[in-house]
């Protein structure tokens, strides 16, 4: 699994950025930390509909029931958003993912105000897809 910051650290790092250009660069840097997605996982079953860019997300439980997320995108900023989402869900079980509303976290970053409408819709599609994957594992 990629080395992603805990949500509190991510929020602190985000707040330390001086402007939105730095924040976007930080998001892109987070995306670069994601492990490469195997080609066999880049298939229609793992493709997230509702995203303007191509986004693939795979959710698998480990031996302890913790959901391990894998993902990629053909767009750097979207790949970074995947990493932000994954940092919020890392270490959680399927039940915890289904019950967790991460939208307040994104609101606290004011991220939706600075994303294009299509990226905001794509972010929402990613959140729905991860929760649906988790719910299917219950």
From Swiss-Prot:
GO cellular component terms listed in the entry, alphabetical order: cytoplasm
SUPFAM superfamilies xref list: SufE/NifU
Superkingdom, taxonomy of origin: Bacteria
Active site, per annotation: 51 (cysteine persulfide intermediate)
Coarse class of the protein's main subcellular location: cytoplasm
Presence of the UniProt keyword S-adenosyl-L-methionine in the record: no
Record InterPro entries: Cysteine_desulfuration_SufE, Fe-S_metab-assoc_dom
Function statement: Participates in cysteine desulfuration mediated by SufS. Cysteine desulfuration mobilizes sulfur from L-cysteine to yield L-alanine and constitutes an essential step in sulfur metabolism for biosynthesis of a variety of sulfur-containing biomolecules. Functions as a sulfur acceptor for SufS, by mediating the direct transfer of the sulfur atom from the S-sulfanylcysteine of SufS, an intermediate product of cysteine desulfuration process.
Annotated protein name in UniProt: Cysteine desulfuration protein SufE
């Amino acid at each position: 699994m990629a080395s992603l910051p805990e949500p509190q650290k991510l929020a602190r790092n985000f707040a330390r950025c001086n402007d939105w250009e730095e924040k976007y660069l930080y998001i892109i840097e987070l995306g670069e930390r994601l492990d490469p997605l195997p080609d066999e996982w880049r298939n229609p079953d793992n493709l997230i509909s509702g995203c303007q860019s191509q986004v693939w997300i795979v959710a698998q439980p480990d031996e302890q029931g913790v959901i391990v997320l894998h993902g990629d995108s053909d767009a750097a900023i979207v790949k970074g958003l995947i990493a932000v989402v994954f940092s919020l869900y890392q270490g959680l079980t399927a039940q915890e993912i289904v019950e967790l509303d991460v939208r307040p976290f994104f609101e606290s970053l004011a991220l939706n105000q600075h994303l294009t409408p299509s990226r905001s819709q794509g972010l929402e599609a990613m959140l729905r897809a991860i929760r649906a994957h988790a719910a299917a594992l219950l």
